[in-house]
């Protein structure tokens, strides 16, 4: 019975490996095909291929970077900026995405949200890096505390190290919260419509607060039906039609 169960488990593992390998091979082939469409100047076809990969969950910084380039070549600066931002959300230090993002912003005259002073100081690392630091600090502190509990003599160095590890974990958790809730955090969205008006109320006839060029940044505060209430550049707030924006985080 044990031998039969082992054989079944082995067959399942082989099948799963084969399926996963086939899926990766297929996505690589589709990505290569999309790149070929782009190289041959068929940008709309390349966009369709890249978007299909994104919808299937095959996310990578290079996929969104290439998708941003394709949108840029069609003159859709809003979606170009959106996808450069998505590339940077996955890989913070992507120099090509940083450079092209700035070019697209200049072309579109897009408005940016200004980070708070705490965000500016914390932006040398990403949320993922702070999360890793928090987990590492927490577990190092736990091991030190367990060691102190069972040790015959409590070392001052071990106590200091465990305290330092807990401090690192706490500060890293605070950094994750600040960045996630900040101007570049989970609520960040990009204006994809053209000459979008932020209004005082949820009506097309309401007075305009600010005209937002494509690619402008907003921070979503709440949603009411087809409208989004958002923090805007220049420390303003207003209502925007949801169809004219897309969140950076998927």
Stretch-by-stretch model annotation:
Residues 110-150:
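Membrane-embedded alpha-helical segments of integral membrane proteins
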Residues 210-242:
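SH3/SH3-like beta-barrel superfamily modules
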Residues 161-193, 200-203, 207, 231-250:
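Boundary regions of SH3-family modules and the immediately adjacent low-complexity/disordered segments
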């Amino acid at each position: 019975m044990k031998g039969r169960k082992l054989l079944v488990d082995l067959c399942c593992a082989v099948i799963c490996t084969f399926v996963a390998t086939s899926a990766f091979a297929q996505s690589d082939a589709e990505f290569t095909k999309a790149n070929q469409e782009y190289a041959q100047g068929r940008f709309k076809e390349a966009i369709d291929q890249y978007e299909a990969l994104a919808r299937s969950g095959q996310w990578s910084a290079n996929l969104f970077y290439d998708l941003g380039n394709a949108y840029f070549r069609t003159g859709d600066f809003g979606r170009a900026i959106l996808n450069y931002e998505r590339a940077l959300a996955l890989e913070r230090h992507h120099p090509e995405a940083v450079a092209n993002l700035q070019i697209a912003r200049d072309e579109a005259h897009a408005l940016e949200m200004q980070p708070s002073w705490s965000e500016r100081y914390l932006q040398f690392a990403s949320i993922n890096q702070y999360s890793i630091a928090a987990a590492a600090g927490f577990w190092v502190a736990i091991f030190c505390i367990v060691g102190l509990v069972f040790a015959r003599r409590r070392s001052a160095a071990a106590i200091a190290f465990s305290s330092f590890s807990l401090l690192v974990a706490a500060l890293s958790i605070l950094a994750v919260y600040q960045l996630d809730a900040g101007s570049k955090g989970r609520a960040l969205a990009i204006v994809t419509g053209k000459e979008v008006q932020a209004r005082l109320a949820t009506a097309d006839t309401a007075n305009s607060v600010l005209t937002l060029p494509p690619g402008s940044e907003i921070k979503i505060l709440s949603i009411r039906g087809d409208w989004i209430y958002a923090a805007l550049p220049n420390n303003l707030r207003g209502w925007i039609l949801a169809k004219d924006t897309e969140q950076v985080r998927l």
